[in-house]
């Protein structure tokens, strides 16, 4: 059995890069956020890979990936609308039906399901800025082929 999360993360990064724009500018997508990054941005990271179905012919795993949306505004301006809009775009691109699943066949995997496990919103009112964050959790059931 092989680790599929790296391929899922790569597929998500590829699908989202230069695909979501706010105010005429593309929202950057990172796995590792650089120190000079400015908001808004999206961070994609792996959470877990658990074997889910046990049968004699194939390995099936449930792979969970999170996408964190980070926006920020001066303390007395802006709001969470921008994070809502970015989350909506993410879900339209990532949470698809079977015809839109990632093609991982060249990596030896087949995507069986894609599920939105939920979106959680946070607001952090700090001295310099107010940060609006959203965590999108996506679960993919993956078959080793």
Regions found by a protein language model. Name each.
Residues 35:
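Short, charge-patterned binding micro-sites
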Residues 38-49:
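A short, hydrophobic beta-strand-centered structural micro-motif
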Residues 1-27, 32, 47-145:
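Charged, amphipathic alpha-helical segments and their flanking helix caps
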């Amino acid at each position: 059995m092989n680790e599929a999360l790296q391929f899922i993360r790569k597929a998500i990064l590829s699908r989202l890069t230069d695909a979501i724009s706010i105010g005429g500018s593309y929202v950057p997508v990172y796995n590792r956020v650089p120190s000079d990054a400015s908001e808004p941005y999206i961070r994609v990271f792996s959470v877990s890979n658990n074997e889910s179905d046990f049968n004699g012919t194939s390995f099936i795993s449930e792979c969970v990936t999170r996408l964190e949306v980070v926006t920020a505004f001066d303390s007395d301006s802006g709001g969470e609308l921008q994070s809502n809009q970015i989350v909506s775009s993410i879900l339209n691109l990532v949470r698809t039906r079977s015809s839109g699943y990632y093609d991982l066949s060249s990596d030896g995997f087949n995507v069986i399901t894609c599920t939105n496990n939920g979106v959680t919103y946070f607001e952090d009112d700090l001295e310099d800025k107010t940060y609006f964050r959203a965590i999108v959790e996506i679960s993919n059931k993956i078959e080793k082929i």
